[in-house]
Amino acid sequence: MTDLRTEELDFVIPDSCIATQPATPRDSARLMVVPLDGSAVQHRVVRDLPDILHHDDTLVLNHTRVLPARFHTKRHDSGGAVEGLFLQEVNGRWQCFLKAGGRLTPGLKLDWFDGQHLVLDEPAAEGWWVRPEPAGSPEGLLAAGGATPLPPYIRKARKDRAESFADATDRDWYQTVFGDGRAASVAAPTASLHLTPELVQQFNSLRVELEVGAGTFKPVATDRLADHPMHTERCHVPRATLKALPQATRRIAVGTTALRTLESLPSPLPTEDWSAETDLLIMPGHRFRWADGLLTNFHLARSTLLALVAAFTGIDRLRDLYDEAVQEGYRFHSYGDAMLLLPGDHA
């Protein structure tokens, strides 16, 4: 692995480049096609994928679904606002990030909706452990009382631009058209947001699931990337995918989450359904075993996602590509445009 200095992942993206809503229709998003042999970049749109990829290429898709994991409550004792983000459920307790103006203490009751409460149990390694009262599943309670977990930079950009969209609209925008897995992610596999049913039907595809956690947005705080404490996420690969994977001619991972799932697979490949937790950190120097190309969005500076893309391109070329994307007016981050990294024989 390359001993990458985190400062090499620094760059400045103008606020005007941050997308606050997706392209409509989904496949009208712009697409920067990057041959990995160093030849010239092409500027296309996502709906051109059938003309860009080989007819026998295989897309690897993350079928996870996004929970409406953000919620707004009030302290039962004072009425003060407490905002939360659901992370996971373990034995009836929820791990949540909580943001409040005052001090939070065990036993505090939060009023949520329609007589539903959350009671603080104890601090967690990150955030708090809370208990829903009455008890209920995260899927059911958050569907009724939660909101789309948009990244903070989108919410900030909307506020700065005085933009407002109904949560029902974001619930549609921030969900893939093909996702039929467990609703357990607190962020979308955003490269997949560009795909339409018509596009997906034109390719062979393989199914994986990775439950995207809040750690995906966590900036690298260490001086060396290798020292970053990588977040853990749950992933699942069904037997059918494991059987078909070695026979695929070129495997194009749609999104960093699909790619991390593939590269986390043990060797030799399991012969039955495989589930595990992965904390794989992919950086320059990584030797890819199961991904020949990658469809991805334009990522935040100082992020592990950016380091993953640099594992394909090298950090210097990636910085040049991002500079070109800014100059060409590409839209960045979760609701933004896409980049397609391909072997040089893609044409």
Pin down the residues of each PLM region.
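Surface-exposed, charge/polar-rich loops and edge strands
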Residues: 1-347
